[in-house]
Amino acid sequence: MRKWLSCLMVLVMLTVPMIQADAAEKAVLALGADLSADQRAVVLSEMGISEEEAASYQTIYITNDMEHQYLDSSIGASVVGRHALSSVLLIPQESGAGLSVETHNINYCTIAMYKNALLTAGVQDAKVIVAAPSQVSGTAALIGAVKAYETYSGEEVAQDAFETATNELVLTGELMEELDSEQISDLIAYLKQKVAENGLDDPDKLEELVKQAAKEMDMSLTDAQISQLVDLLLKLSKLDIDAGKLVSQAKELYDKLDDLGIELDTKKVGNFVTRFVSSIWELIQGFMSRD
């Protein structure tokens, strides 16, 4: 019996690096098309990868035209600029691992902002590294992350989901100029969760939800800000967002909401992989106790 258990444990331990290696092989590098050779070297260094490693990844290029296509209506052509520099490395993770984000030389978009917007676009189970050769806002990096995910998954992100994700990122940034950035990200995450859970699509009910959530978080919103959030929630209500996936993909964010005393009906949603490994370990312990 112990020999069988030893073999099982070896198999489990061997499977983990195999999954990680497979994920690395499928990684997608989305580079700003206007990077110079020196800027490219800086970006790769910030991402923690060598030229040799980069050569093994599937590489796509994000052009300035693409940035204007997706961002002009939200932030204006002059803000988008004329050079595509923001770059993204997307490394797929095993199912249930969730979505993680790290940033380098990004001075405007926060990790929580990226997470919220990427979840809206449908990105999941991935490690996303956003980097630029020098300090930039990072708004355009959302395009690189989504396009990298499309390349990896082989599925195109729905246009309405992409547009809503962009709108969410931009609105979060605008509100962040007048309010606390963490609070805004927490508020939008909570509102999105409630819309997904309850299928809310009535403007009056959404306005009531925004006001109640702001009160619980001790935030003071103007009528204009409330209206902007309601407009965003109406767009989110038209998307097929899975409430359970929101929690499992951004567990730290939703755990934080719980710590703030803001309850989510989907707290019962756990990480399947964690529960599976735990069950296997309990089974092994049960067998060993019989010897």
Question: What is the predicted function of each stretch?
Answer:
Residues 2-22, 280, 284:
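Sec-dependent N-terminal signal peptides of Gram-positive bacterial secreted proteins and lipoproteins
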Residues 19-66:
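Short, extreme N-terminal leader segments that mark the start of a protein/domain
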Residues 68-123:
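Signal peptide-directed extracytoplasmic domains
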Residues 119, 129-137, 144-219:
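Soluble oligomerization/assembly scaffold segments of membrane-associated complexes
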Residues 28-32, 87-91, 98-103, 127-131, ...:
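Soluble periplasmic/extracytoplasmic beta-strand elements of cell-envelope proteins
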Residues 219-291:
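Charged, long alpha-helical assembly modules
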Residues 32-36, 75-76, 93-95, 104-106, ...:
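Solvent-exposed coil/turn segments that connect beta secondary-structure elements
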